[in-house]
Amino acid sequence: MISFNNVSKVYESGGQSVHAVEDVTLSVEKGEIFGIIGFSGAGKSTLLRLVNMLERPTAGTISIDDKDITSLSTKELRKLRQRIGMIFQSFNLFNSRTVFGNIAYPLKLAKVPKNEIKERVNELLKFVGLEDKANNYPEQLSGGQKQRVGIARALATSPDILICDEATSALDPETTTEILNLLKKVNREYNLTILLITHEMHVVKEICHRVAVMEKGKVIEEGKLFDVFTQPKTKTTQNFVRSVINDHLPESVLAKIQNGGQIYRLTFTGEETGQPVLSYIAKNYNVDVNVLYGNIIELQNVLFGNLLVELQGEQREIQKALQHLRLQVQLKEVEAHAS
C-alpha cells in the first residue's frame, strides 16, 4: 500500500545539513494500523508529511499502490491528497463553522452536490456519535468531541489512507481510549489503512498491528506489535516498552539479589499464561517459590506475562525445578546489575 524506499529528507540550516529523515525503508500493508513511535525530533512528523507530498524527499522514493508519488504532477498530487485523510493533535477545526460545516468543507472543495454532502455528513455524524452536535460550534465541544469531528472530516472524501499526527496527545486517558476505539472501528468497518505517529507507547499497544521505532531520523527497529513488545532489541525501544510493561527491578528485589538470592524472570506468552507452572514446581520439587513482581498484558489478543520469582531450597532441587520451568516458559536468571 505505502512503501518508503531509502527515503531521506535533508534541510539546510545555518550552513549545516540536518538529516530529518535518513535512509528509511518501510512498507505499510493495506488495511493495517501502522504506528511510528519516537521522541521529539526523531523525524516522525517529517516522514508523515512526505506521504502526501507536503514535503518532498531529498532522496529515495515513496510509492502508494506501487505508484511512485514523488514524480506526480501538481494535478495528480491534488487527486492523490483526496485519497488521504489526516487528523491532528490540535484538531484544526474552523471555529466559525458548525460541526456540520467542518465535516462538509472537504466535500464542498471537491464540488460534491449539496444533497450528497448532506447525506454523507449525516452518515459520518452518526458514525462518530455526534448526531446531536451538527449545529454546534467547536468552542461548545469537549476535546474528545472535537477529535471526533476531525475524524469525520478526514473520512468525508472516502479516503484509502488515514494519517494520525499525535491524535490523542492532547486528550485525557479516558477520552484517548474512546478515540482509539473509534479509530479501530474506522479501520475495521472502512478497511482503511491507518498510519499514525506518537510518542506514547500505550497508544501503539492499544491499536497498532505493526510498529516502527525512529531515532535521529532513522528507523532503528520495526516489526509486528507482539514481537517488538516482547523482544525489544534497542535501548530506545526497551525504554518505550517499559513505559507500558514496567520491568524495572524494585529496590527490594535488587537487595535480595545482592544478598545472594536466586531471582529469575519468567516470560509467558499465549496459552502459557494460564498454566499453573509455579504451583507445579512447588508441589513436585522441594523448593519454595516467592513471587516478587508480575504483570500480564494483552497484545493484539495475545496474552504476555512477566514474573520475577525467587526460588529457595537445596541447590539440587532448585536445578530440577529450573529444568522443568525451561520446558514450559522463557526463563532468565536476573543478575545483580540488572535494572
Curated annotation (Swiss-Prot):
Originating species: Bacillus thuringiensis subsp. konkukian (strain 97-27)
UniProt function note: Part of the ABC transporter complex MetNIQ involved in methionine import. Responsible for energy coupling to the transport system.
Enzyme Commission (EC) number: 7.4.2.11
Keyword Membrane: yes
Recorded GO CC terms: plasma membrane
Compartment(s): Cell membrane
Reactions performed catalytically: L-methionine(out) + ATP + H2O = L-methionine(in) + ADP + phosphate + H(+); D-methionine(out) + ATP + H2O = D-methionine(in) + ADP + phosphate + H(+)
The ABC transporter domain, residue ranges: 2-241
Binding site for ATP: G38, F39, S40, G41, A42, G43, K44, S45
Keyword entries, A-Z: Amino-acid transport, ATP-binding, Cell membrane, Membrane, Nucleotide-binding, Translocase, Transport
Tagged with keyword Translocase: yes
Membrane topology value: Peripheral membrane protein
Cited Pfam families: ABC_tran (PF00005), NIL (PF09383)
Residue intervals passing through the bilayer: none
Protein's recorded name: Methionine import ATP-binding protein MetN 1
Family: Belongs to the ABC transporter superfamily. Methionine importer (TC 3.A.1.24) family.
